């Protein structure tokens, strides 16, 4: 139960792990709102498909996973999470599609690298995960050229992260992605838009190149783990893992001093009185039991509650599945208030 801003007592879900967010960039655009809601103790999440609202309580929250292309606006607020004993880490997408204009509202590559480094120095490189995601080709952007861009960004990030996560763009599966790639770029037509997805030969070239880059960096003293996000292909022969973006194993390792949270990650119970639960021999849960059933089959994420909303991210990335069109995003942005209980009033 939570008491709303209007004094009503309502039912609320009480997640232990919050995802902020797969659906929009909360750190970049809605940091003030997020911390206002944290202070209030709850937020409202609206299901865009059935328009139903869910109240989300922060009472039991022990960890937040942030997804962003620009963490700079949220950095001045992070001390509030530390003071509340709420753990956090970041998934930071740092691509270089400047020449193609695929990400029109993100800062320059150089500025994003500088912010990435500052955040890594502030909270530790194991809590700042680099994503080059998704991987897209065009008639003028080949896998070899993509690899060179990844090398350039990686050389700037060397030693500031432990992991690189990547995926291949999904175009055929998303009508709105196809429409936006045609409408908002000069790279594709309706007839050619699906060529943004790599062929098997192109994927092989890219994967082999990434593995070679990793080995090159390892020789230079940078041990970087490679992992795919939401990809069914088994790349174990290349030493490439299936990623868990909401990652219980990472959290157990990085936040090991929080015994109650580690206990939750192993058993699914966040004990108010741990000794009482131990009397019943709480069993460890497998990764399969922990899987977030609301995500794609190939997704390895554990259970969490996402509090974002589609059609609210103003980066306007042309490949994004979370935005239908820019006009809708602008209309939604006009309805946002940092003082409301939901992202959109």
What are the functions of these language-model segments?
Residues 98-106, 134-144, 189-201:
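Surface-exposed cleft-lining segments at the edges of enzyme active sites
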């Amino acid at each position: 139960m939570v008491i709303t801003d209007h004094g009503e007592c309502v039912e609320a879900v009480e997640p232990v792990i919050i995802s902020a967010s797969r659906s929009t960039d909360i750190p970049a655009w809605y940091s003030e709102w997020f911390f206002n809601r944290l202070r209030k103790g709850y937020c409202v999440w609206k299901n865009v498909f059935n328009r139903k609202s869910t109240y989300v309580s922060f009472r039991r929250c022990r960890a937040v996973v942030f997804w962003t292309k620009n963490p700079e606006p949220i950095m001045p607020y992070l001390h509030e999470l530390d003071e509340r004993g709420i753990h956090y880490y970041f998934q930071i997408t740092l691509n270089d599609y400047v020449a193609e204009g695929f990400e029109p509202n993100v800062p320059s590559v150089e500025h994003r690298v500088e912010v990435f480094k500052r955040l890594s120095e502030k909270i530790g490189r194991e809590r700042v995960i680099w994503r080059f995601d998704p991987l897209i080709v065009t008639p003028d952007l080949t896998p070899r050229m993509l690899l060179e861009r990844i090398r350039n960004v990686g050389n700037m990030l060397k030693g500031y992260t432990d992991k690189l996560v990547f995926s291949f763009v999904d175009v055929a599966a998303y009508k709105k992605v196809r429409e936006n790639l045609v409408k908002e770029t000069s790279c594709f037509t309706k007839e050619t838009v699906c060529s943004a997805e790599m062929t098997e030969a192109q994927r092989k070239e890219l994967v082999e190149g990434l593995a070679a880059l990793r080995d090159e960096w390892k020789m230079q003293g940078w041990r970087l783990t490679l992992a795919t996000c939401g990809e069914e292909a088994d790349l174990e022969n290349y030493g490439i893992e299936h990623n868990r973006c909401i990652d219980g194993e990472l959290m157990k390792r990085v936040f090991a001093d929080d015994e109650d949270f580690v206990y939750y990650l192993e058993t699914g119970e966040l004990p108010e009185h741990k000794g009482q639960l131990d009397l019943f021999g709480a069993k460890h849960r497998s990764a399969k039991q922990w899987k977030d059933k609301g995500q794609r089959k190939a997704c390895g994420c554990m259970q969490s509650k996402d509090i974002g909303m589609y059609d609210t991210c103003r980066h306007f990335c042309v490949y994004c599945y979370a935005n239908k069109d820019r006009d809708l995003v602008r209309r939604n942005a006009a309805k946002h208030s940092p003082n409301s209980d939901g992202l959109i009033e």
